Amino acid sequence: MKTLFIALIRGYQKFISPLTPPTCRFYPTCSQYGIEAIKTHGALKGGWLTIKRILKCHPFHPGGVDPVPEKKQKH
């Protein structure tokens, strides 16, 4: 599932994103954030973090640097 989500995002980056002007208000971009989140936290939590990030990417949010949160270590 993780691989599928990452492949979908990479497809977006390669085929759809070049057709639109750059509008992401964040660094890293929302699609790169999604890949990093899914690699770090897995498909479910990483996917959820990606959805939350995309919902924040609008003209009324200032944007800025928003890295993927680190995975919490289990004790």
Curated annotation (Swiss-Prot):
InterPro entries: Membr_insert_effic_factor_YidD
GO cellular component assignments: plasma membrane
Keyword Calcium listed: no
Membrane topology field: Peripheral membrane protein
Main location: membrane
This protein's UniProt keywords: Cell membrane, Membrane
KW Cell membrane (keyword) present: yes
Domain of life: Bacteria
Subcellular location(s) per record: Cell membrane
Family annotation (HAMAP family): UPF0161_YidD
Function: Could be involved in insertion of integral membrane proteins into the membrane.
Family stated for the protein in its record: Belongs to the UPF0161 family.
Protein name: Putative membrane protein insertion efficiency factor
Organism name: Bacillus subtilis (strain 168)
Gene: ytjA
